[in-house]
Swiss-Prot record:
Family matches, as InterPro entries: DNA_mismatch_repair_MutS, DNA_mismatch_repair_MutS-lik_N, DNA_mismatch_repair_MutS/MSH, DNA_mismatch_repair_MutS_C, DNA_mismatch_repair_MutS_clamp, DNA_mismatch_repair_MutS_core, DNA_mismatch_repair_MutS_N, DNA_mismatch_repair_MutS_sf
GO annotation, biological process: mismatch repair
Renumbered residue ranges of the record's region Disordered: 809-835
PROSITE patterns xref list: DNA_MISMATCH_REPAIR_2
Record's keyword terms, sorted: ATP-binding, DNA damage, DNA repair, DNA-binding, Nucleotide-binding
Job description of the protein: This protein is involved in the repair of mismatches in DNA. It is possible that it carries out the mismatch recognition step. This protein has a weak ATPase activity.
The name this protein goes by in its record: DNA mismatch repair protein MutS
Coiled coil start-end: none
GO molecular function, one term: ATP-dependent DNA damage sensor activity
GO cellular component terms given for this protein: cytosol
Species name: Lactiplantibacillus plantarum (strain ATCC BAA-793 / NCIMB 8826 / WCFS1)
Protein family: Belongs to the DNA mismatch repair MutS family.
Binding site for ATP: G607, P608, N609, M610, S611, G612, K613, S614
């Protein structure tokens, strides 16, 4: 930057401030505008669609600049913060009229993606979490806070996967770190679109020590202190609304990793990325912003303690049994504003008169809500009733002090009620009498001069004035009117009388405005003392709101109360996918049973594409989640065990960020389940193995099924197009075949969407292609190829069962990896074995060569070497991932 640019006092002040916030847009207050200069102006003008101009445009090096009006600044701040930027607000700390020399300016707040408080109506039901992370050896200290609600929690995480799951669950936009966080982890966090902020220095804050006094783990205390330090440095205001830090353990809840939440569409639709079409969309009949946020938290963290779940169920059942009371409750809840965020604004000093009126209105509904709940013929809501403190002292204070239709500004007057303060009433009388005198003077001057359009007005520059059009100037008496301003078509004057009363009126207005602000500040500080009571109240109202929402949805869609058992018995009669059912509306939804005895581990699901296999699997997972958050479930009846984790491998998606293929993503997600699932987990595997060669895929699918069946024992739904795997029920006692029915009518495929016992007899793939509109000639060719293949591969169906039987005969030891089919190593070369395997199809004379599918035999040296390695392979000691890796090495060696 040229030295001349820095020489002016204002520019020196600007750079002194800007150097403290190099990574933020600096909004520099100049009069009624916030200005940006240099690179901030160039980039800000582009992002905010502002006109870029220059300061000192005639100079050798004009300064790029742009600005926004101070009254509209919040909108522009929100735009930048939503785009992931920080904004430093540099305010004038003294009245420019009274300043001696350069006006003093300071940054009063650094607004960041994780600290912004002003959320629009569309985000009222969404938390905005600021997170913090420190790394010590193999452990992570993790904390998060929502500055708008005061929530503050912390945990010690032991794995990278758990950390990433927490970050994605919280949907955090900003994380505070120190030097301990490794660069590779930082890079991984950045790929999630999270802004990384540094806070390396932490100094003791005695005034905030109470927030960490209940923490017993050093790592948790350290990370919370770092988070609080960052908040203090950036926000520069009271944090009285922050609640004491609560330590939590992710394992205390049903674990759902990011992929499972995505695949099950809990919060966002896969297709649109929006709320509609999700479980949240279905269940959200909440009437308050607090209730909406709590509902998301419950869906994100289902319970695993039977007594806690049943407590929620009892409350939902009670509300279901009392329709009229529930309707009255809903009506009162609609009148309750966002108590949590109103309390946050009070603490931050950003609350206005309108906010306080909303707080009063909300508090006035609490006695009515208490009465409705106390009238229920049950004691299940006793805890909530006891927490419904109407905070009457605060409501009465606001009612006495603040006008009903309060303005947004608290510095321009008009906020305090008449009669609240005697001195204020006197000032207002002086103002009103003065204005009455002005009106009388205007009438008198018109009569004296004979000028009918003479008027008395006011502006902040010239004060009160008498305005006369130029056509009537000759009618004014001489020597009594003092000219103040000349306009195009008029002149403005003053008189000695007007001047004397003007000073009295303006003095009264000034004193009145100043006193009003002082009174408002006292009211705000009194309300501030009740923040903890307001937060306790908000939590109770939020819980009541979510429970009534469950009751409404359960009644509207005929949900039933699930019976929770400690056994592994799972029985759902006429279960439904709740979201699909809602989307279908009046169309008939085909319900299905899901039954698995304690000894049954795997349901192997076959059936054509588009028949509903994936929907059936998701349906079970959503039913489990709904049950464990305390809601009723979509079924005629339901008996469920309590699950500790849900794993899903549904859909085909490349990981573009990591550059990984669909198959690699599939294997990693499957491996995650195999490594971490327990006998109390629910596992959903959809079409495992479809991303690789046929025999490779089938080999892996069978090995995974056997591994889950023999060693994990988790309840598993496994859908597949490998019909050969259906023979596994002959050897795996805990596996049962089911299929989704379909039939042909007049050559057309009709999906029955009904899950029936046994394996599917056909996959109907060509029929589905026909439904997709593929060319007739292509479909005819596909049918011809299909017939030939079915004739040639009739022996394959016995392979899976015979391999499983062979393994059983060889007494596979518990806790060792399941065996692999030998054809996985060399798809076309028969290998001597005690177990019969599928032979490579050989075309008979006269048959048409199916060159698209036929695979050449391996007879070269590389193939022989692979064959020898296969013969010596210790299959009994290999995991499915070991097998996958070995197959990959062989494929590379064979040039595939």
């Amino acid at each position: 930057m040229p030295q001349k640019t820095k020489d002016t006092p204002m520019m020196r002040q600007y750079f002194a401030v800007k150097n403290q916030y190099p990574d933020a847009f600096l909004f520099y207050r100049l009069g009624d505008f916030y200005e940006m200069f240099f690179d901030d102006a160039i980039k800000g003008a582009q992002l905010l669609e502002l006109t870029l101009t220059t300061r000192n445009h005639s100079a050798e090096n004009p300064i790029p600049m742009c600005g926004v009006p101070h009254r509209a600044v919040q909108n522009y701040i929100d735009i930048l913060v939503d785009k992931g930027y920080k904004v430093a607000i540099c305010e004038q700390m003294e009245d420019p009229k009274l300043a001696k020399g350069m006006v003093k300016r300071e940054v009063i707040q650094l607004v960041t993606p994780g600290t912004t408080l002003e959320r629009g109506a569309e985000q009222a039901k969404t938390n905005n979490y600021l997170t913090a992370l420190i790394q010590r050896d193999q452990q992570y200290g993790f904390a998060y806070a929502d500055l708008s609600t005061g929530e503050l929690k912390t945990s010690v995480l032991t794995t990278n996967d758990t950390l990433i799951n927490e970050l994605t669950s919280l949907q955090t936009k900003e994380i505070v770190v120190d030097d301990s966080v490794a660069s590779d982890l930082r890079d991984q966090i950045k790929t999630l679109g999270i802004l990384i902020s540094e806070q390396n220095n932490v100094t003791p804050q005695a005034q905030l020590s109470y927030l960490t006094q209940d923490l017993t783990v050093d790592l948790e205390q350290q990370v919370v202190e770092r988070l609080l330090m960052y908040i203090t440095v950036t926000q520069k205001r009271s944090l009285a609304h922050l609640q004491k830090a609560i330590a939590y353990e992710p394992s205390y809840f049903l674990k759902l990793d990011h992929n499972s939440k995505y695949n099950l569409e809990l919060m966002k639709s896969i297709r649109t990325g929006k709320k509609q079409g999700t479980l949240l969309w279905l269940l959200d009949e909440t009437k308050t912003a607090m209730g909406g946020r709590l509902l998301k938290q419950w869906i994100d963290r289902p319970l695993i303690v039977k007594a806690d779940i049943e407590t929620r169920q009892n409350k939902v059942a009670t509300l279901l049994d009392h329709y009229f009371e529930r309707s009255n409750l809903q009506e009162e809840l609609t009148k309750v504003y966002d108590l949590e965020r109103l309390a946050g604004r009070v603490a931050f000093g950003s609350v206005n008169g309108r906010d306080l009126v909303q707080l009063k209105t909300s508090l006035r509904q609490i006695p009515k809500i208490r009465y409705i709940l106390s009238e229920l013929d049950t004691q299940v809501f006793n805890d909530e009733v006891n927490q419904l403190d109407p905070v009457e002292d605060v409501a009465d204070l606001i009612d006495a002090a603040i006008v009903e239709d309060a303005p947004l500004s608290v510095t321009d007057g008009g906020v305090i009620k008449d009669g609240y303060n005697e001195q204020l009433d006197q000032y207002r009388d002086a103002m009103n009498n003065g204005k009455k005198w002005i009106a009388e003077l205007e009438a008198q001057e018109r009569a004296t001069t004979g000028i009918k359009n003479l008027k008395i007005g006011f502006n902040r520059v010239f004060g009160y004035y008498i305005e006369v059009t130029k056509a009537n100037l000759a009618q004014l008496p001489k020597d009594r009117y003092e000219r103040k301003q000349t306009l195009t078509n008029a002149e403005r004057f003053s008189t000695p009388e007007l001047k004397s009363h003007e000073s009295l009126i303006l003095e009264a207005e000034s004193h009145s405005t100043d006193l009003e602000y002082q009174l408002f500040t006292k009211v705000r500080e009194t309300v501030k003392k009740a923040i903890q009571r307001l937060q306790t109240l908000a939590k109770a109202v939020a819980a009541i709101d979510v429970l009534q929402s469950f009751a409404v949805v359960s009644e509207d869609y005929h949900f039933v109360r699930p019976k929770l058992t400690k056994s592994h018995d799972l029985k759902i009669v006429d279960g439904r996918h709740p979201v699909v059912e809602k989307v279908m509306g009046n169309q008939s939804y085909v319900p299905n049973n899901v039954t698995m005895s304690p000894d049954e581990t795997v349901l192997l699901i076959t059936g054509p594409n588009m028949s509903g296999k994936s929907t059936y699997m998701r349906q079970l997972a959503l039913t489990v989640i709904m049950a464990q958050i305390g809601c009723f479930v979509p079924a005629k009846s339901a008996q469920l065990p309590i699950f500790d984790q849900i794993f899903t491998r549904i859909g085909a998606t490349d990981d573009l960020i990591s550059g990984q293929s669909t198959f690699m993503v599939e294997m990693q997600e499957a491996n995650n389940a195999l490594q971490h699932a327990t006998a109390n987990s629910l596992v959903l595997f959809d079409e495992i193995g479809r991303g690789t060669a046929t025999y490779d895929g089938m080999a892996l699918a069978q090995a995974i099924i056997e591994f889950v069946h023999n060693h994990i024992h988790a309840k598993t739904l496994f859908s597949t197009h490998y019909h050969e795997l259906t023979a596994l029920d002959q050897e795996l006692s805990g596996l049962r075949n089911v299929h989704v029915g379909a039939t042909e009518q007049d050559g057309e495929l009709v999906f029955l969407h009904k899950v029936e016992p046994g394996a599917a007899d056909k996959s109907y793939g060509v029929h589905v292609a026909k439904l997709a509109g593929m060319p007739t000639s292509l479909l005819e060719r596909a049918n011809k190829i299909l017939t030939s293949l079915e004739n040639q591969t009739s022996t394959v169906s016995t392979t899976a069962a015979s391999i499983a039987a062979s393994d059983a005969a060889n007494s596979v030891a518990p806790n060792t990896a399941a065996s692999m089919p030998v054809e996985a190593a060399d798809e076309s070369q028969p290998v001597e074995s005690e177990t019969p395997v599928a032979e490579a199809p050989v075309a008979e004379a006269g048959d048409e060569q199916l060159s698209l599918f036929a695979e050449p035999a391996v007879t070269d040296a590389k193939g022989e070497k692979v064959l020898q390695q296969l013969k010596t392979l210790n299959l009994m000691a290999m995991t499915p991932m070991d097998v996958m890796n070995q197959l990959y090495k062989w494929q590379q060696k064979l040039g595939k």
